[in-house]
Structure formats: structure tokens, C-alpha cells
Amino acid sequence: MALVPLFVTVVSRPVRAAFGWGWLYGTVYFLVLLRWLDFTFRTYSDIPWPLTWGPMLALAGYCGLYVGAVAGAVSWLAGPSIGRALAVSPLLWVGAEWIRGHLFGGFPWGLLGYSQYLSLPVIQIAELGGVYAVSLVIVAANAALAGCLVLSRRSALNGVVLAGVLLVGTLAFGAWRLSAPAPTGEIRIAIMQPSIEQPLKFVPGHAAETVGIYLALTRGAGAERPQLIVWPETALPTPLRRDPELARMLESLSAAVDAALLVGSIDVEGKAPPKLRNSAFLLTERGIIGRYDKIRLVPFGEFVPLSGLIGFVRSWAQFIAELEPGSRASVFSGPPAPFAVVICYEGIFPELVRELVKGGARLIVNMTNDAWFGRTAGPWQHLAMYPFRAVEHRVAVVRAANTGVSAFILPSGHIGRHTALFERTVLTEPVPLRAGETIYSRFGDWLAYLALGVSGASLALRAWRRAA
């Protein structure tokens, strides 16, 4: 109930002070959440400590603005009625989360709903309204408790009853959905976790050893008869389409294990200067039969925004690349079944996964390299978002990570077999295929749009009444 003190504070403060308290609250929250960024910059950049805190402070301060905006809006609406302000606060919060996930390219990391990723009965409502539905329930519960401290007994009771009905309805729906029979169709998939330290991934002298690790893991997986074997993001040390010998080796490997291979590689196209893309290739004994180029690139990781003005930052860190985004959310037709790939943090964008599901994907594969995060909370925070993609569309998610956390996630959002960080291993499991369409698959972020509409109308009505 971490939002209760914030709501109690801001309903009795002027708007400007409330915004300040909200911004401070949000900034501290994101500083704690994003502290793995300090590790990344300390380890892989030339920025001296303690200046490595700079990027983390900047991002946390930016994300904190959205909490400040919600706090300021609640304060303003509380002028004529604290009860109504608290009633609207869940919608204000959801609207702010949606805007943060879209403005300036979007950064939907750490949405409040993700905190419940292990609470399966709670997160089942994501199939109705996405992760935003879970955020709404959490904020509603906090607002009701805050009302107990600042409202009259009758008004507070009304708020508690409404929030209680919402929470009980959420849990009842969750219990009902968790008792539903599982989909019948399934395929057998193996995921590789090679646990190759980031500094070694693209060192020329280590290339042969890297390939050898993958070959050994894949041959070992072949004994369990998978139909698809998944390697992580940028697994290959050389661009696949520029290395015919490596391509032939993978074709032979696919034939030997009798399974399709899904491998991550940098793709190089053109000359002087070539275009580089972060790609996933599907191979069989017949060669490359499909390719997906990453669409959502990581700012200051895979490209530099406003590079004409601040392109100099590339010299600060070895992890800053200049990649070209893909242009199409493509779905692999198989083998073994229609599936789609999201690379690295693409899967934290609900609308992209929805587009892939609408395109016919019956399975979602996430290929990632979270070695940049080291042994911090970063890889676990990244993992926590994928149960929601599973529930939103009732689709299984298969996750192959270079250093972890690799996992099989069921359509219920349950995280099944998974690895530890920096563990070299192979996991093989039968994976169910998506069989139907959810409300979220069909209508997308309708709840977020409703939240934005009601929030905007509430603020406009307050402004009109104040001016009248």
C-alpha cells in the first residue's frame, strides 16, 4: 500500500507542492528500481564513478514526472471534493502509465501492475485490459485506504466497498480463468543459455569458442527431440549472412538434430557504410527460411536519439551502437508452427506483441541478452513483464537469454522451468499453442483510452467550474 502516504499528503497540498511531492516520490521509486543502470555504466562505459549515476538520475527524474503529474492532478481535483479526486486517481495513474509507455518512443518499464507478476489470480484480468487493469486495481485499493484517513466515515466506507468489490471481482475472475482447461495443441522447444560474459561476445579470438559452446548445447538438446531450438539475441559472433561457412554449419546442425534453429545475429546490409540490424534468423537444413529485424531499438544502446546534436555520447560507452530498426512486425510461418519473435526489451511494449498475435502468432519467443545487467535486479525485472504478455493473449512465451533469466511462461502467466543467472544450460519443454482470442487481443488498450478520456473530462470539468 505504498501509495497511501502519497495520496494522503497531496489531497491537502496546493497543486505545485503536490506535484513536487509526487515527483520526489516517483524519482526515489525509479532510482531504486533502475539502480542496475549504474552497474551497466560503471562496467561498460568510460564515465567515471560517481558520474555513472547521472544517466540513472536523469531517467528516474523523467519517470518521476508522471507520478508528479498524477499527484498534481489529484490535488487539483481534491479542491471541491477529495472523495471524487481519490475515485478518479486510478484512472489518472493508468493514463499516466500509458503516456509514459508511448511518449518519446516510450519507456513502459516498471509499470505498477508488473509488481504482481507472481500473483496469478490477480494478473488474469490482464486478458481484459492488459497490465493497465492490474495497475488500476492496485491504485484503487490504495486510494480507498487513503480515503479512510482523510474522508468522513461514510465516504470512506463507500470507497472501501467499491475497491473491495473490484478486488473480489478480480480474484474471482482469476480463480475462474486459472481453472479453465489448458490448450491441447503443443510443440516441443529447447532454449539455449550459453552464459557468455558480455566482454567476450564479439572478441575475434573468442569466436570459435562461442560457436563451439552453442554447437555443444544444441547437440545435447537434440537428444530430447525438440522441434525448435532457440538461441539468444546476437548469439552469433559474426554476421550470419556474411559468413557462408557458419551458415552451412548451422544447416548441417539443423539436419543432425532434426529441428529448426532460431538464432540471433547482427545482420549487415549494403556498403559504405553498411546498415546494421539486430535480427533473428530461422534456419533448417534448407538454409535461412525466415528473418525478423528488431523494430524497437534501445535508446542510447542501439541508437542515439537526436544524434546530430548529441552523437558524441557514443564515445562514452562501448555498448552504444548505431543500428537500423526493422520495418515490419513479421510472423514466422514455421516450422514447427506460426510464431513471432520479440528481441530484447521489445516485449515490454504490449502493442507490439498484440500486433504479432493479430498477425497469426500462436507462440511468442523472446530472445535477449541481459548480460549488460550483470548480477543485478535488471534481468529479473525484465522477466517480470513477460507473464503479462502471456496472459494478455493467452499465449505461451519462450525466453532464451544469454546469461539468464531463460524461462518457459505458460498462457496463465505461470513461470515454469527457468534458469539461474550465469548458468550454462539447456531447457526443453512442451509448449502449448495459442488457441483463441482475448478481449485484449481484440480491443487492445481500451482501458487506457477510457482512463485518458475520463481523466481529461474530469480535469476539464474542474477547470470549467472554476472559471464559471
Predicted segments, located by residue:
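Membrane-embedded alpha-helical bundles of multi-pass enzymes
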Residues: 1-177, 374-375, 386-390, 401-409, ...
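Soluble catalytic domains of enzymes that build or remodel membrane lipids, polysaccharides, and related
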Residues: 177-447
